[in-house]
UniProtKB/Swiss-Prot annotation:
Binding residues for Zn(2+) 1: 25, 27, 153, 272
CDD domains in the cross-refs: PTE (cd00530)
GO biological process: catabolic process
EC number: 3.1.1.104, 3.1.1.25
Name the UniProt record assigns to this protein: Phospho-furanose lactonase
Species in which this protein is naturally found: Mycoplasmopsis agalactiae (strain NCTC 10123 / CIP 59.7 / PG2)
Signal peptide per UniProt: none
CC cofactor note: Binds 2 Zn(2+) ions per subunit.
């Protein structure tokens, strides 16, 4: 990796080789938004609890946390900057721009629905290159923070890609092309992941800068293998400590399978601890004993070793892959004429053209 490769944190760009053990998809502060309609546990605004959680992560050897809260879906630039400043020189915080799944946006009046794609791309590029809007593009005022986004989020729903989600995927791909910023996509219960990868690449995104999340909720190792081999993207397994979906042993076995197939360069890990009772220190504020970010080190990494995943592969998954994937690419010029014919036809079918 070239020495000038960098990862964009909220406190500035850092050398990619310095980011250390990285949690590639997590949450520390979630300041309201549509997720709260699903469960009140999605409201996470306790800065002190979040700081304690980061400290435990650091104490276990963690160095970088990528927080995947896009504008209007929990993102809080003020509080996240406070946390980042508290750990300056000890831990890196990366924040996101972009969108979540279409269910979180009004299909008629949201700016994702109303604003032309070209203009939304400009808005996202500004968040990466100039600074995130402290008001989350709620309008009519835009106030740029000193903190810039270091990753682009998109999202898709269960077993279908909504027309607004395809629009958000195009925005993500074009923003990534223009800025070099990496992409991570929420795939609901791990569905439509292959199609998501194909569409992003069809728009021109670099597959090495794409991560797909929540595939662990669709426990099919052959599906994972197919996605990686056919598209070259990376799967971010974000679900240790989710026994309601599957035991940790199943996820560990799936990772071992992929490693044995020579695909360890296409795996990253995280906790996706985006609810109060998914973090130890938030749980304590509710009078509950729960697990937290330290679970990765105390329980899941030992399990990976137990099932036979080598230390070399673990180092790739936790350190080497994130620093390559999260490092900004060389910016390119978006060329609409090079978009795949399949994506162009899908845009026509979904009346996006």
């Amino acid at each position: 990796m070239a020495k000038d490769k960098f990862v964009r944190t909220v406190l500035g760009d850092v050398p990619a080789e310095s980011i250390g053990i990285t949690d590639c998809h997590d949450h520390l502060i979630k300041n309201g938004g549509p997720e709260m309609h699903e469960h009140p546990d999605f409201l996470m605004i306790d800065v002190e609890a979040a700081k304690k959680e980061v400290q435990e992560y650091v104490d276990h050897g963690g160095k970088t946390i990528v927080t995947m809260d896009p504008p209007n879906v929990g993102r809080d630039v003020y509080r996240m900057l406070e946390i980042a400043e508290a750990f300056k020189g000890k831990a890196n915080i990366v924040m996101s721009t972009g969108f979540h799944k279409a269910a979180f946006y009004d299909k008629y009046s949201s700016w994702l629905a109303c604003v032309p794609t070209d203009d939304i791309v400009k808005m996202m590029v500004a968040e990466v290159e100039e600074g995130m809007d402290e008001y989350n593009y709620n309008g009519p005022v835009v106030k740029r923070s000193k903190a810039k986004a270091g990753i682009i989020k998109a999202g898709t729903g269960y077993a279908a890609i909504d027309r607004l989600e395809l629009k958000a995927l195009e925005v993500a791909a074009r923003t990534s092309i223009t800025t070099g910023c990496p992409i991570l996509v929420h795939t609901q219960l791990g569905t439509m992941a292959l199609e998501v990868a194909q569409h992003l690449i069809g728009f021109g995104a670099n597959p090495r800068k794409i991560q797909l999340s929540h595939l662990n909720k669709n426990p099919d190792r052959y599906y994972y293998e197919k996605i990686i081999k056919e598209t070259g993207v990376t799967i971010c397994f974000d679900g240790p400590d989710r026994v309601k979906y599957y035991p940790d042993s199943l996820l560990a076995d799936h990772i071992k399978y992929l490693v044995d197939k020579g695909l360890q360069k296409h795996i990253t890990l995280s906790l996706d601890a985006g609810r109060i009772l998914y973090q130890r220190n938030y749980g304590l504020t509710k009078g509950k004993e729960t697990f937290g970010l330290s679970y990765l080190f105390e329980r899941f990494i030992p399990l990976l070793k137990q099932v036979g995943v080598s230390q070399e592969a673990i180092d790739d998954i936790l350190i080497n892959n994130p620093r390559e994937i999260l490092a900004f690419d060389e910016p390119r010029v978006y060329d609409a004429s090079k978009v795949s014919s399949e994506v162009v036809q899908l845009k026509k079918d979904l009346k996006l053209l």
